[in-house]
Amino acid sequence: FIVPIRDKEMNVLPGITILDCGHKMGLNGVDNGIITFDSVEIPYENMLDRFAQVSDAGEFESPIPSDNRRFFTMLGTLVGGRIGIPRSALAAAKTGLTIAIKYSDKRRQFGPETAPEVPVLNYRMHQRRLMPYLANAYALHFGLQYLTKRFMHRSEDDMQEIEALAAGMKAYVTWNTRDTLQECREACGGKGYLSENRIGDLKADTEIYTTFEGDNTVLMQLTAKNRLGEFRKQFGEMNVSTIFNYVLGQAKTAIAEKNPFATRNTDESHLKDAQFHLDAFTYREKEITASAARRFKKLVDDGLDTFDAANVMHPHMLQIADAYLDRVFLEQFSAAVAETSDEALKEVLNYKTKVY
């Protein structure tokens, strides 16, 4: 509904109370507030009825007959928000990394007795603190590009998968931003604590990203539920144990040539091979999903209702979502590198895919 809350003189209308949320950890330029309504009547013509209407006789009507399709059609705006939030979060992570890496390249500390002090970035441990997050930033950048393009060119049939992917990426990226900025702050020492260096503001403003547009843990459960649903569709009414054994067998066969656990191949070129990495991520995703399906079926067979079984399964379901998103991000990162024509840039990006 469209609900007027003030008159033409901007006075609050009767029955309506407007309050400010108060000072927050960050984003204080955003005017978050509370509105309450007490016996406020809303005219019928104020109803937003693009996807559903109520007739004069009080009957519900909709041009979209399927309840499921109507629900996901109306979720379109929410999905857009879940794409915008991680893009904003990733921008903050990139900024923090730029500040921390540039600072550590200039900040000198210790060195050989007869030589000048060396940049902090020269220390392997410092590289291990920051470079994995830099690799993450590239992987997440290309993954979010992929999601954005799919959303912009979506069809109704794609919406459930896009909604699940957006939910998962929102959680994955905002958690990564939280961890990235914390590591950047610590890697800059006391300088990272100074407001003039911006990391504190970046941390404060992005902290809320892990819970608005949906709590991250709940969103990951949504993603996992979608993956289990897709898993079930692929195999129809097959026995879950049969499905598990089939998928495991297929996955092991597909990866056997490049799986060091199967072939005992510990050659450096093999272990650093990009296709091996992607095969391994795919294998992991399939195995975790199949094992979760089998476990869920057993819980239900043992007498738990589906609600309680899902409650027991939540930690396992988060692993499904993690494995799925790990694979998608690596897949899109690798695809972007393959399309890069600048050979010098391609070499650097290839290295970053390996770090990821």
What is each stretch, according to the model?
Residues 2-356:
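Flavin-dependent oxidoreductase catalytic core characteristic
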